[in-house]
């Protein structure tokens, strides 16, 4: 029984969910211009975890054929037959329904609709539509990971404001550099599975140039938040400092690639997580000072 429970938890990919939820609470604080009720935060986080877990579980169900090919994913529960495909799909659908009801009945229905939209986008647009067909898969499909900022804002206000849209843009432009760095490291895995990630189908110099381009767009979106959300000097200084750090790392990986050196892409991958965390911590601080 414990093995089965662990398998269901693994299907939800909670380490990925953690990163998504890092953005939710600061956005709720910014929308509230203070600290929302702990009850609202708790319900939003639990329901958001279930929504993301639902999308991830259904993704594992759809991708079980390629997961057994990739070294990075071959120990997932469906590959090891810890749970059956039917059990996994049922679990994913059930927790998605629970998430919708929690958002709708305990938060508000706009947030429920956004959560459902995130699940549908990730499953149908990214997993079933783009992932195996185009190197733009993560560029377009990555929008699913941006929904938590919209949900966080909506949970507090019942609407989606321009500040939330800009933060959506920050995460949207952050996603390609983050995942392309990972795909550079595991290029052979993706190639063996037939997934046309950009590092699989394009020269590495093209990949690193695009990483630099998306990094500038991300930093620009983060700075545009200052006049729109009136975030003040604490956020401005933080966004400039961590943005400059990210751009320096993006240029470093591009330079090393052009020199023919090992680009060490996982360095960018890990620091991108730190960047996003620090930026949203600055948003949280701004909301309460």
From Swiss-Prot:
One Gene Ontology term from the biological process aspect of the record: heme O biosynthetic process
Top-level taxon in the UniProt lineage: Bacteria
Catalytic reaction equation(s): heme b + (2E,6E)-farnesyl diphosphate + H2O = Fe(II)-heme o + diphosphate
Cellular localization per UniProt: Cell membrane
Membrane-crossing segments per the record: 9-29, 35-55, 89-109, 110-130, 138-158, 164-184, 188-208, 228-248, 269-289
Family recorded in the similarity comment: Belongs to the UbiA prenyltransferase family. Protoheme IX farnesyltransferase subfamily.
Family matches, as Gene3D superfamilies: UbiA prenyltransferase
Protein name in UniProt: Protoheme IX farnesyltransferase
Primary enzyme class: transferase
Gene Ontology molecular functions: protoheme IX farnesyltransferase activity
E.C. designation(s): 2.5.1.141
């Amino acid at each position: 029984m414990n093995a089965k429970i662990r398998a269901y938890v693994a299907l939800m990919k909670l380490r990925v969910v953690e990163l998504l939820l890092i953005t939710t609470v600061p956005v709720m604080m910014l929308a509230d211009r203070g600290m929302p009720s702990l009850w609202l935060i708790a319900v939003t986080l639990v329901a958001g975890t279930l929504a993301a877990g639902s999308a991830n579980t259904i993704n594992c169900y759809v991708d079980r054929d390629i997961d057994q090919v990739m070294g990075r994913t071959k120990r997932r529960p469906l590959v090891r037959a810890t749970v059956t495909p039917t059990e996994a799909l049922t679990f994913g659908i059930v927790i998605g329904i629970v998430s919708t009801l929690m958002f709708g009945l305990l938060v508000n229905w706009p947030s429920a609709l956004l959560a459902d939209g995130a699940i549908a986008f990730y499953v149908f647009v990214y997993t079933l539509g783009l992932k195996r067909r185009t190197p733009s898969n993560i560029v377009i499909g990555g929008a699913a990971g941006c929904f938590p900022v919209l949900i966080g804002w909506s949970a507090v206000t019942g609407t989606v404001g321009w500040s939330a849209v800009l933060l959506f843009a920050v995460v949207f432009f952050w996603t390609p550099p983050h995942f392309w760095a990972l795909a550079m490291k595991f290029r052979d895995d993706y190639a063996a599975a037939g997934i046309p990630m950009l590092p699989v189908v394009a020269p590495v110099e093209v990949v690193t140039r695009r990483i630099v381009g998306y990094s500038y767009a991300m930093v620009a979106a983060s700075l545009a938040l200052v006049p729109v959300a009136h975030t003040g000097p604490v956020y401005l200084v933080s966004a400039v400092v961590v943005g400059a750090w990210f751009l320096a790392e993006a240029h470093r990986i591009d330079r090393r690639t052009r020199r023919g050196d090992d680009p060490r892409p996982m360095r960018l991958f890990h620091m991108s997580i730190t960047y996003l965390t620090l930026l949203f911590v600055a948003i949280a601080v701004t909301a309460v000072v």
